[in-house]
């Protein structure tokens, strides 16, 4: 049986972690690399770095971040944020990233996923899907969740798998930031309609929420940000709690 994964997510803007990090024992509380290294030591299975810097020099900032992360962190990590071409992906993987996350670029040009998986293999291509319920329909949103599309989330998830995504990062915008639990029903529904792993994101607030997303939500991995950044839940305790609930965790 495959083990479940716990993945802290770090949003990076202009080289600093955003979402207000308050680790007192870090020299620079805003340094994503130090924070990532700390999570790695604590037993995180993977890390996701999303660069939300709005600059023209996007690829340059991404690559610099990847190089620094790769030097200091020995667990797999995914980089995302403005990745839209074979060149972007090549630069990030060559700099040391294990996977890349593609979102709006796939919506703009779905064939990009075919190209990327053919060029690099689907094991390193993650498609991020931001979804929100609009009038009873789960619709995909682009541009950091700001622009609604007319794409149905389930149909889009299936299409992305068919085109070569190796993994889906599903963020429920309805749940994001609420700390009221993951979107388990939607996550489970998508999980039963695709065969690739689903990373659930949005809504983590308690350890029980993680139990639920793995059991009810059928997720393969759970991603969270602020509950880890603000030390509300510590990763070692979370993993031992989940193991105690009969959920297979990576040691």
Curated annotation (Swiss-Prot):
Q: Which reaction does it catalyse?
A: 5-[(5-phospho-1-deoxy-D-ribulos-1-ylimino)methylamino]-1-(5-phospho-beta-D-ribosyl)imidazole-4-carboxamide + L-glutamine = D-erythro-1-(imidazol-4-yl)glycerol 3-phosphate + 5-amino-1-(5-phospho-beta-D-ribosyl)imidazole-4-carboxamide + L-glutamate + H(+)
Q: Name one Pfam family in it.
A: His_biosynth
Enumerate the UniProt keywords alphabetically: Amino-acid biosynthesis, Cytoplasm, Histidine biosynthesis, Lyase
Domain of life of the organism in this record?
Bacteria
Q: Which NCBIfam families match?
A: hisF
- UniProt xrefs under PANTHER family: IMIDAZOLE GLYCEROL PHOSPHATE SYNTHASE HISHF (PTHR21235:SF2), IMIDAZOLE GLYCEROL PHOSPHATE SYNTHASE SUBUNIT HISF/H IGP SYNTHASE SUBUNIT HISF/H (PTHR21235)
**What does the function comment of this entry state?**
IGPS catalyzes the conversion of PRFAR and glutamine to IGP, AICAR and glutamate. The HisF subunit catalyzes the cyclization activity that produces IGP and AICAR from PRFAR using the ammonia provided by the HisH subunit.
**Mind telling me which SUPFAM superfamilies this protein's record contains?**
Ribulose-phoshate binding barrel
Q: Which HAMAP family match?
A: HisF (MF_01013)
Record InterPro entries: Aldolase_TIM, His_biosynth, HisF, IGPS_HisA/HisF, RibuloseP-bd_barrel
Q: What is this protein called?
A: Imidazole glycerol phosphate synthase subunit HisF
Alphabetically, the GO molecular function entries are:
imidazoleglycerol-phosphate synthase activity; lyase activity
Tell me, how does this one assemble? Heterodimer of HisH and HisF.
Name a single GO biological process.
L-histidine biosynthetic process
User: Is Amino-acid biosynthesis a UniProt keyword of this protein?
Assistant: yes
What's the Enzyme Commission number for this chain?
4.3.2.10
Q: Which residues form the active site?
A: 11, 130
